[in-house]
Amino acid sequence: MCMSCISKDCDCQKYRSYTIIDTTISNVNLVRVNSGWYKSGLSCETKLIDYDYWIGKYEITNKQFYDFLTAAVKQHKIVLKQHKIICFYNGDDNIESGLFIAKYPDKAIYIDSTNQLRLSNQLANHPVIGVSWFGAKAFCNFYGFDLPQIDEWEKAARGNFCIRFPWGDDIDSTCANFYNSNDPYEPYTTPVGFYDGNYKNSFYTKNSVSSYGCYDMAGNAWEWTNDRFNQSSPYYCGKGGGFNLHNPAHMQVYYVSTFRVKEDNPPLDRTHLSDGFRVVKRIKNHEIFYHH
């Protein structure tokens, strides 16, 4: 029996014979992106993704990442050492296995004087930032997710519409969080889903949701993807722009930025102030997902 479909539009009867997968984390909201055509790049080339997948409705929050860290510490998959949050990466064709910084402590998630993780409740629902690519992958691996590929991210942001931003072609401070956008949290992140068409005290927001139901795909936090700049590059691609981005044009759905994830000499890891992420789960063998 389908206990609780993550997509509010999920037709449980339709998927009765499908396998139900428990994501093991209760508060990651996912929306379904069906296989099909979408518009890609500056020229709006029509491209195909021939499989269905789930993608995060929101960027991963400080609370979600904190919950991951505390659970992973207990399982010895995250280590707190010398005021650092460290994860292990299994390695790939380009990066050797080893220990890497998962995230530097900040005012949202920090390590206290007793070497215990702490969370700022005031920032619990803001996107986690300052996360390394390795930290984002560690979160995904822990819960059975992955980072989205650029194509998956862009389709979820734009659909089959030749538009510059997830909601259309124009941008102003009521649509997204960027540098000097004068939101109530300036000069920092806003809570995920903040731009939903409602007044927040005296600050008016437009509903900046994508056609698939994703929020904050422009501004707030840069989002790590699973794609390298090229096969031998230490740079991975980011999408969407961040709260400290001076040029909103770089928040357009087809824009790709690159971030170095490791150095050739110690320290081998690299984090960036405004880098966060959202998750993806590719659907295989007619799976659907539920959460508690």
Language model features: what each stretch is:
Residues 18-20, 43-44, 257-269:
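Short, P/G- and charge-enriched loop/turn segments at secondary-structure junctions
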Residues 32, 54-56, 137, 146, ...:
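Residues within well-ordered beta-strands of beta-sheet-rich folds
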Residues 22-98, 130-134, 219:
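A short glycine-rich, aromatic-capped structural motif
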Residues 78-117, 174, 182:
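Core domains of carbohydrate- and sulfate-ester-processing enzymes
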